[in-house]
Swiss-Prot record:
Recorded family membership: Belongs to the MinE family.
Source species: Thermoanaerobacter pseudethanolicus (strain ATCC 33223 / 39E)
Entry function: Prevents the cell division inhibition by proteins MinC and MinD at internal division sites while permitting inhibition at polar sites. This ensures cell division at the proper site by restricting the formation of a division septum at the midpoint of the long axis of the cell.
Gene3D superfamilies: Cell division topological specificity factor MinE
UniProt protein name: Cell division topological specificity factor
SUPFAM superfamilies linked: Cell division protein MinE topological specificity domain (SSF55229)
Length: 91
């Protein structure tokens, strides 16, 4: 189930965020600059804040390398985004 479909609203913002996340996965390294990671956080917050109020103090976003079953590594984006409350979305 697509989480954002249940909120309705702007499909364009969702697609932009999806494309940006896919670009992250193309990179074969997990070591990124703090500036790059901060840009990712801001983009994610901008999209998600259309649907929910976020506790930014508890926000944690990081990129790691995870080992796959074939012993290769793939970058992974981990985001812990505490939600204060859901926003009312017109359907």
């Amino acid at each position: 189930m697509d989480l954002f479909k249940s909120f309705g609203g702007k499909n364009n913002s969702k697609n932009i965020a999806k494309e940006r996340l896919q670009l992250l996965l193309v990179h074969d390294r997990a070591d990124v600059s703090p500036k790059f990671l901060e840009m990712i956080k801001e983009d994610i917050l901008n999209v998600i804040s259309n649907y929910v109020d976020i506790d930014e103090a508890g926000l944690n976003v990081e990129i790691t390398k995870e080992k796959r079953s074939d012993n290769t590594y793939i970058p992974a984006l981990h985001a812990n985004i505490p939600i204060k409350k859901m926003k009312q979305v017109i359907r």
